[in-house]
């Protein structure tokens, strides 16, 4: 593993541009390289456009080739990207075997061992919902739109006065409500990265 401090961000079509832009400014300004990864379907690279069509990213790092030991943490970007990444071309008989879900399982194992940070924001807990074993018993925050998905997958959504809280931390899992929380989310995520 190199001495360069790096974080991994999983991304796909329909990602949230606000988060994308803030990640690209905040983390490098605080000493971290940001690497984007997606499932490339056998291609050398793929380009993805954000929800509002104001940002585009070309990714050449396939999820199936990621070595999590190269990173201190991983963020699942918001928007609809994680819904796309949990897609399986053929349904498995047991648990979801999409490459992104398998990578998340590895990340959660490292996170639970106290060696890795995982962050989600807005709708990106959808990737956790693909395998309820990943979310069961954890407290999180998320977009109101996916509240039922998260609860049905075994998560406990933290609320205050009928709204999900802005940012919540459960061990090394940091969750943010929506893009409006991205600055607060980034600060909490960075603080945890720096303690590893």
Residue ranges with predicted function:
Residues 43-51:
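Membrane-interfacial amphipathic helices and adjacent loop/beta segments
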Residues 3-35, 43, 55-196:
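Active-site-adjacent pocket-lining segments in enzyme domains
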């Amino acid at each position: 593993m190199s001495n360069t401090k790096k974080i991994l961000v999983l991304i796909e079509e329909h990602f949230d541009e606000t988060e994308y832009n803030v990640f690209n400014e905040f983390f490098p300004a605080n000493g971290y390289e940001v690497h984007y990864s997606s499932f490339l379907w056998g291609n050398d690279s793929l380009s993805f456009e954000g929800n509002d069509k104001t940002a585009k990213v070309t990714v050449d790092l396939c999820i199936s080739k990621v070595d999590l030991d190269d990173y201190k943490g991983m963020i699942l970007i918001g928007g609809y990207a994680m819904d796309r990444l949990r897609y399986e071309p053929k349904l498995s008989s047991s648990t979801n075997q999409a490459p992104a879900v398998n990578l998340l399982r590895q990340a959660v194992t490292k996170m639970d061992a106290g060696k890795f940070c995982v962050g989600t924001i807005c709708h990106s807990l959808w990737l956790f919902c693909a395998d309820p074993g990943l979310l069961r018993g954890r407290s999180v925050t998320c977009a109101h739109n996916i509240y039922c998905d998260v609860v049905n997958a075994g998560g406990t959504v933290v609320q205050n006065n009928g709204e999900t809280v802005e940012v919540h931390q459960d061990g090394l899992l940091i969750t943010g409500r929506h893009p409006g929380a991205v600055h607060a989310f980034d600060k909490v995520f960075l603080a945890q990265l720096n303690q590893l």
